[in-house]
């Protein structure tokens, strides 16, 4: 039986009364975000707006993005990544559970030295995919060209942020490569594995 989103007490600075807010609202106020679903336009826009708002509010205090996601839409994920690079505060990324596909791209986008994986977390990288079987030939060719550009961009970012040679990253992206937290650290996707 679902319990909904839990409520927690919160007292605004300078106010005497405590109010009850949903737990995510409370955590956002502490600069903690959660990506716990497929990456799509809606969650992407929510995370982007929170990062921008909180970076304007205080640009010297780190933001924390906790990730447990199977991936999702490439463009929406790239928008989150770009925002993480754009905002002034460092964005620390923490993988808890799974960071697969575009979610691993978001994970690697955290501030270098501030990318963490929980001990039993899993990370998966692969190349971007599409559903060609429904497309007309002309659309198929255009979509294939766009996918190739996206793959080149994603590969370039992984190379830059992991320090791995392009041939290693390209080879790994040919198929689904699942990694443990320590393997992701050896790959340069995360910097630290949280202590058990």
UniProtKB/Swiss-Prot annotation:
It is found in: Plastid, Chloroplast stroma. GO terms for molecular function: ATP-dependent peptidase activity; ATPase binding; serine-type endopeptidase activity. CDD domains: S14_ClpP_2 (cd07017). The gene is clpP. InterPro entries: ClpP (IPR001907), ClpP/crotonase-like_dom_sf (IPR029045), ClpP/TepA (IPR023562), ClpP_His_AS (IPR033135). The keyword Hydrolase applies. This is ATP-dependent Clp protease proteolytic subunit. GO terms for biological process: protein quality control for misfolded or incompletely synthesized proteins. Keywords: Chloroplast, Hydrolase, Plastid, Protease, Serine protease. GO terms for cellular component: chloroplast stroma; endopeptidase Clp complex. The active site is at residues 101, 126. Cleaves peptides in various proteins in a process that requires ATP hydrolysis. Has a chymotrypsin-like activity. Plays a major role in the degradation of misfolded proteins. Its main location: plastid. PANTHER family: ATP-DEPENDENT CLP PROTEASE PROTEOLYTIC SUBUNIT, CHLOROPLASTIC ATP-DEPENDENT CLP PROTEASE PROTEOLYTIC SUBUNIT 1. Component of the chloroplastic Clp protease core complex. It catalyses: Hydrolysis of proteins to small peptides in the presence of ATP and magnesium. alpha-casein is the usual test substrate. In the absence of ATP, only oligopeptides shorter than five residues are hydrolyzed (such as succinyl-Leu-Tyr-|-NHMec, and Leu-Tyr-Leu-|-Tyr-Trp, in which cleavage of the -Tyr-|-Leu- and -Tyr-|-Trp bonds also occurs). Belongs to the peptidase S14 family. Pfam families: CLP_protease.
């Amino acid at each position: 039986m679902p319990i909904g989103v839990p409520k927690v007490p919160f007292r605004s600075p300078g106010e005497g009364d405590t109010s009850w807010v949903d737990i995510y609202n409370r955590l956002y106020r502490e600069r903690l975000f959660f990506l716990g679903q497929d990456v799509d336009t809606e969650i992407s826009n929510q995370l982007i707006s929170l990062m921008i708002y909180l970076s304007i509010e205080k640009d010297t205090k780190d933001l924390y993005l906790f990730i447990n996601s199977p991936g999702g839409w490439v463009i929406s994920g790239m928008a989150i990544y770009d925002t993480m690079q754009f905002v002034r505060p460092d964005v620390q990324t923490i993988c808890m559970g799974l960071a697969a596909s575009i979610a691993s791209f978001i994970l690697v986008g955290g501030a270098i030295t501030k990318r963490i994986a929980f001990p039993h977390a899993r990370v998966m990288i692969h190349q971007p995919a599409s559903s060609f079987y429904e497309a007309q030939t002309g659309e198929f060719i255009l979509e294939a060209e766009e996918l190739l550009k996206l793959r080149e961009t994603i590969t370039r970012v992984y190379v830059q942020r992991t320090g791995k040679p392009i041939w290693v990253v390209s080879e790994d992206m040919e198929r689904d490569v699942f990694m443990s937290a320590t393997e992701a650290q050896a790959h340069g996707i995360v910097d630290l594995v949280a202590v058990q």
